[in-house]
UniProtKB/Swiss-Prot annotation:
Claim: Kinase is one of the keywords in the record: no
Name of the molecule in the record: Thiol-disulfide oxidoreductase ResA
MF (Gene Ontology): antioxidant activity; disulfide oxidoreductase activity
Family designation: Belongs to the thioredoxin family. ResA subfamily.
Keywords: Cell membrane, Cytochrome c-type biogenesis, Disulfide bond, Membrane, Oxidoreductase, Redox-active center, Signal-anchor, Transmembrane, Transmembrane helix
Lineage: superkingdom: Bacteria
Organism of provenance: Bacillus thuringiensis subsp. konkukian (strain 97-27)
Biological or metabolic pathway of the protein: Protein modification; cytochrome c assembly
InterPro entries for this protein: AhpC/TSA, Thiol-dS_OxRdtase_ResA, Thioredoxin-like_sf, Thioredoxin_domain, Thioredoxin_ResA/DsbE_sf
């Protein structure tokens, strides 16, 4: 009887040690990439609505205006036409606008893009992993990424055309 109780306690102790060890390993040894102002922007790979691969690191040498948005978001809806209007001018100057939708259906996003005739790359953050990495709250939230791939500013909330143009000027190479 005492042997069974001792064996049971040893097994419980081993399970607890294993759980603590696993927790420590997860916390200290697995490094999850997070966005930090002044640091290199966390890379991501998505497929845009036209089936083209977008990988952030491919835009080194260009400024990137990274916008997180949703079709249901009224402030997002208001600023999209301004981004669309400014896109050709700043694309010529070496600035890319990338809009990442907050994990909605393809049909909802495609309808929105068609309705506003958006010309810049639009993709869906399936599963919301990129939003988590960038710590996005609320929508819209945008990030200015310079030609060296560093995040230089986070912008929360709706922007006017004039504000957007100032931000695009900041990241023009």
């Amino acid at each position: 009887m005492k042997k069974n109780r001792l064996l049971f306690r040893v097994i419980i102790l081993l399970i607890l040690c294993g759980a603590v060890g696993f927790t420590l390993y997860q916390g200290y040894f697995t490094k999850e990439e997070k966005m930090e102002i002044g640091k290199e922007a966390p890379n991501f790979v998505v497929t845009d609505l036209e089936g083209k691969k977008i990988e952030l690191k491919d835009f080194k040498g260009k400024g990137v205006f990274l916008n997180f948005w949703g079709t249901w978001c009224k402030p997002c809806e208001k600023e999209m036409p301004y981004m669309n209007e400014l896109y050709p001018k700043y694309k010529e100057k070496g600035v890319e606008i990338i809009a990442l939708d907050a994990d909605e259906t393809d049909i909802a996003v495609k309808n929105f893009v068609k309705q506003y005739d958006l010309k810049f790359p639009v993709a869906i953050d399936k599963g919301g992993e990129i939003i988590k990495t960038y710590g996005v709250i609320p929508l819209p939230t945008s990030f200015l990424i310079d030609k060296d791939g560093k995040v230089i500013q986070e912008i929360k909330g709706e922007q006017t055309k004039e504000q957007l143009e100032e931000y695009l000027k900041k990241i023009t190479p």
